């Protein structure tokens, strides 16, 4: 038994066997989507969880409401936007919309996790002279590794399993 057939499928340059290139493209798109989701979700969830500002609950309600809209409903507007930006058949044209699919869930998940972190830790940091960015990056994010890991798994799986958007956008 040899691995010649696997080598042929994964590393062949023929048109019929480009599995290696497809795997690499899927990995780039899924990984880029995860990175974008982690950064944007964390930065959006922190103010929703910890800062007091007018309309905070309305924004969160709209975010939760957007989770109830099926992704298929947004395909045509998404396509038109990506087309106007000139992103069709590009990595950013696949990564940014894929991240948008998981963004609302990511903000919801991280906001709920941030609410569970004791506010006294932030108060102590403020007394020590930390600003909001330092509190976020040096206290909240290090404590959020479990939630960020879970979000990474969900976002990666969502991007990896998406077939319809790449079929339309490429």
Language-model-detected regions and their locations in the chain:
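A structural signal for multi-pass alpha-helical bundles of membrane permease subunits
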Residues: 1-170
């Amino acid at each position: 038994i040899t691995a010649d057939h696997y080598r042929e499928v994964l590393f062949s340059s023929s048109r019929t066997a480009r599995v290696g290139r497809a795997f690499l493209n899927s990995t780039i798109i899924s990984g880029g989507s995860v990175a974008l989701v982690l950064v944007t979700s964390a930065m959006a969830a922190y103010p929703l969880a910890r800062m007091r500002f007018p309309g905070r609950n309305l924004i969160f309600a709209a975010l939760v409401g957007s989770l109830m809209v099926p992704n298929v409903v947004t395909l045509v507007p998404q396509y038109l936007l990506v087309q106007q930006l000139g992103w069709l058949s590009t990595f950013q044209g696949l990564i940014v919309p894929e991240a948008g699919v998981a963004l609302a869930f990511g903000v919801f998940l991280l906001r709920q996790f941030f609410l569970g972190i004791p506010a006294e830790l932030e108060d102590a940091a403020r007394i020590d002279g930390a600003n909001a960015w330092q509190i976020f990056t040096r206290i909240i994010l290090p404590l959020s590794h479990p939630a960020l890991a879970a979000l990474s798994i969900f976002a990666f799986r969502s991007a990896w399993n998406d077939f319809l958007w790449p079929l339309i956008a490429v």
